[in-house]
Amino acid sequence: MFIMNLLLYIIPILLAVAFLTLIERKVLGYMQFRKGPNVVGPYGLLQPFADAVKLFTKEPLHPLSSSVLMYTLAPTLALTLALTIWTPLPMPYSLVDLNLGLLFILALSSLSVYSILWSGWASNSKYPLAGALRAVAQTISYEVTLAIILLSIMMINGSFTLKNLIITQENMWLIVPAWPLAMMWFISTLAETNRAPFDLTEGESELVSGFNVEYTAGPFAMFFLAEYANIIIMNALTTMLFLGPSFNQDFTHVNTFTFMTKMMILTLTFLWVRASYPRFRYDQLMQLLWKNFLPMTLALCLWFISIPMALACVPPQI
């Protein structure tokens, strides 16, 4: 039964990722006054399936000088982590109810750095290695901000349990009292998922295509799926932390629908940002974090620690 639950969790995520690629191409197309994919199926709806068939039927090649085991493991690890990270998420019921759900999500998102590093190193080529080193530096840097913001939210929430966030936000979404944190969180998730304007790992003019230059067919598709699954999970987490997922015992399907709607709006905002902004320079990227975000998040973290003590009250407990 547990295997069935797992499959019923994974298949919709993979379908959502497949259609997100189509939505991205359509949105970018209309923002640039063109149509986007419109040949395969009605309105191009079958385009993701055509892409999947093409990618998974091609022969997976690898460079002669590459480390084959690590080269193969990297995309597998990336996709496994991207799918595992969904398990503690209450929508409104989770597959695994963890007491430290937020720490679990943070730990798994940090592990994705290894798949990027392995892919760049195992390719034994200068462009993938340069892209991988950039990606690792960027991801680890922005993990710091994400962790401090999560700590601040946990001070308000009173625990690391994701379900407790639903109770905390019954009367007011946390985006209202903690809007600076929400703003920095959203920008940090853009950097964490290597999306524009922080897509320095895939700078076509500098690095050809970043850490996955040498990948073809199935392994390339696995990296692609992992990237888009991470975008969706980050937006799901943003919804959970700041946009108060409602919970009604009688209408659980409505709860899931509202949760998904908020998540979809945030995902479309990701695409809007990609269509609107040029890529940052590497020094600007690091300056934004270490000189702007880090001091602000530390100050706000101290603020949210001191406020309950100053007002002689405690966070809500289950």
Curated annotation (Swiss-Prot):
EC code: 7.1.1.2
Domain of life: Eukaryota
Gene Ontology CC entries for this record: mitochondrial inner membrane
Family annotation (PROSITE patterns): COMPLEX1_ND1_1 (PS00667), COMPLEX1_ND1_2 (PS00668)
One Gene Ontology MF term: NADH dehydrogenase (ubiquinone) activity
Localization of this protein: Mitochondrion inner membrane
Role this protein plays: Core subunit of the mitochondrial membrane respiratory chain NADH dehydrogenase (Complex I) that is believed to belong to the minimal assembly required for catalysis. Complex I functions in the transfer of electrons from NADH to the respiratory chain. The immediate electron acceptor for the enzyme is believed to be ubiquinone.
A GO biological-process term: aerobic respiration
Entry's family note: Belongs to the complex I subunit 1 family.
Membrane topology value: Multi-pass membrane protein
Catalytic activity: a ubiquinone + NADH + 5 H(+)(in) = a ubiquinol + NAD(+) + 4 H(+)(out)
Keyword Mitochondrion recorded: yes
Principal location class: mitochondrion
InterPro entries according to UniProt: NADH_UbQ_OxRdtase_su1/FPO, NADH_UbQ_OxRdtase_su1_CS
Entry protein name: NADH-ubiquinone oxidoreductase chain 1
